[in-house]
Amino acid sequence: GTRLEGMKASHPFVGQGYDHDVPFLPGDHVAVDTGTGLVHTAPSHGIEDYDLGRRYQLEVPETVLDDGTYASWVPLFAGDHVFKVDDKIIALLSDSNALAAKEKIVHSYPHSWRSKAPLIYRTTPQWFISLEANCLRHQALDAIEGVHWYPSQSKNRIKGMVENRPDWCISRQRAWGVPLTIFVHKETKQPLIDASVNQRIIEAVRKEGAEAWYKNPERFLGHDHDPADYEPINDILDVWFDSGSTQKFVLEKRPELEFPASLYLEGSDQHRGWFMSSLLLGCGTKNQAPYKAVVTHGFTVDEQGRKMSKSQGNVVAPDKIAETLGIEILRLWVVSCDYSDDLRIGPEILKHQEDIYRRFRNTLRYLLGALHGFTSEEHPSLEDMPSLERWVLHRLHQLDTLFKECTQAYNFQAFYSALHHFCSADLSAFYFDVRKDVVYCDSAQDIKRRATRTVFDLLLNHLLHWLAPVLCFTVEEAWLARFGEDRESIHLNFLPETPEAWKNEALAQDFDVLRAQRRVITGALEVARSQGLIKSSLQAHVTVFDPQQKMLPKVDYAELAITSSLDISIEALPSTAFISSDFDHLGVQVSVASGHKCERCWRVLKEVGNHPIHSTLCDRCVHVIDEVT
């Protein structure tokens, strides 16, 4: 095929109006293993042919009219219908001795998806916005750099589209739409550019609507132009031009709104749609993008990642979820998803969201119960709080920082995933468990209990505000339960303050170590429980062997591990000790605690039975009972 490149052939109908030579052109769309490897090229009737014709500067004539017939200037076939002229062409080829063979074959052909009728591609005169004139493409690429794109990779996507897109064809031949409102000179084919004409069109459209253009458009020409010289164009605007114009009639027409918009939000397919048209119109009219930030999301699919379809029976309807599970489960699912990809939904996924919701709700319910009767008079100073409470405040500071960062970046999944982990691992499985004894058994005036309830109050306040955008009704219910019907809605409140003094990285590092050590101890307790040595951790006495002296000083490990007593030994690890791979320098032995069980706090202590009146209580519980009686 390459040997033919540059050669020319005579047209088979030479002398009959086709006296031009036909060039041989190399085309990447032609396959050597299909057919002859030689195909007819018509730049007016195919995308690949058009591109090839543009590359080699071939003419692109309008040969076929709207009714499917050849134009009057086409030799031999003027007025013939493109689908009814085959026999005539074959006869002319035969008469010209240019027909090598004829045969009916079956091959793929473009067709209408609705009517199933065959189709042809054809070029027609259209109106375009040039991306090169006035440097529109360059302006758009510069504007992209000044926009915040979420997710960040969407910036490269729209940037590549702007770099490679052709000029924007803004005209359409449809019966309904916004008219182009252009007059073209019949001889020169140039559009009429006259400010007074445009102003008359604007005033008419403002009064009569877009239909004004179709009601005697010659009236807009005024006295300066002869209607006989001009033809009104009845094409309509590309609907993407309409959508891209929303910046004009939504933002600029409303004084309470600002331009550019804070955010444009749509599906990922709108990079070449609404986002693109808005960008080009913004740059073309205002020299800037019409938005400060753009968020794009994927599409909802079923649990297997398949597109939803009624025929497949895999449609998950939001209203059905709202009726059966409640709208908050649906909202929680939304913030739990990575919306930069397609969002999967189905029964198992929603069941997981129910579990997450239940964790949040149970956390709020526990805090509400523990805060019964709490007032601000219980507040101790930060310096007087135990290290455990100060660690929780540090975690609140971390989460508050994360909340603000994630909401600014529209990364809701990262925050609410972290918040669920906080409620599950930090609160329920650790802090609440450790402080249950303090809340239920310590004196109301004890500094540790006051500090605990103060932190509970701060926890509840922050959790409610963080969850308010998602669990709107649950949070309002908890808010009213805490403060009563007289308090204004939480949704009218600002976020609570998070003092910088709560931040304590050194303490956080200590608690990373403490919790790892605690996991070794609780691992040993689980083994003892499974062996039947104890039934609960409060029945245990624990000895921790720490020959490398890694255990932290001034820490009540018995309290953290929820045991009745705990000793630390620096002796070598005995062979019978429980050893964890996480801390292989620690060994733990569990034995049954000595003493009697306090019937109030359930700790097993030797002091139980020593008091003459309260013989079933430990010293701490005796003191509390005496205080309230």
Where are these regions (language model features)?
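Residue patterns forming the tRNA-binding/recognition surfaces of aminoacyl-tRNA synthetases
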Residues: 6-8, 17, 33-194, 212, ...
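Alpha-helical recognition segments enriched in aromatics with Gly/Pro capping
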Residues: 56-68, 174-176, 184-187, 195, ...
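Residues immediately within or flanking Cys/His clusters that coordinate Zn2+
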Residues: 109, 182, 595-598, 615
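Short cysteine-rich clusters marking metal-coordination/redox-active sites
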Residues: 112, 185, 221-226, 598, ...
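Cys/His-rich microdomains that often coordinate metals
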Residues: 119, 192, 605-608, 622-625
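Cys/His-coordinated zinc-binding microdomains
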Residues: 173, 227, 602-605, 619-622
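Acidic, turn-prone loop/beta-hairpin segments
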Residues: 184, 230, 374-405, 432-524, ...
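Short linker/helix segments within small regulatory modules
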Residues: 607-616
